[in-house]
């Protein structure tokens, strides 16, 4: 079951967001939380756009069911996730206060612009998340030590034929992290795939099983 909402704050930017609760949701039970950051093409004020890709696409179009709480905020038009780091962290805080979230199992993922946003948000507060999965995002190599020192589990996907965000962005990010002794980061190469590595990542059971197995 998914629903559309607006998050408001007196001191932070406001977001529209989509929320998914598992079948037979029990408010007395703790659930993993998956936070999804969409790409540049899904910005604006139409939440249907924010469900074009990723796990919510398969909930909406195919009736797929997942064992986690899902929230997908929507980035305003012509803006970038990097503009909203503090607001996103406050948003996550509120979600954890209002829903029965297992705070040892908070996962962050995103695609393209949202993949870059995933890197940025994780670097701002690496201890917040049990694992991250940046999909075809631009790397931030010079801050690789932050994630390496936090030993944050990371699973990347990238198409080797991506001409929008080149494959080397993820490859270089992996090298930057591993250079500092991180041993729980990996990159899955989608051979022959362009920018749409998300179509492979979010239908890959390996990613979901790996993510849900991570706990702080």
Which residue ranges define each predicted feature?
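A domain-start/cap signature at the N-terminus of enzymes
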Residues: 1-33, 109-111, 116, 121, ...
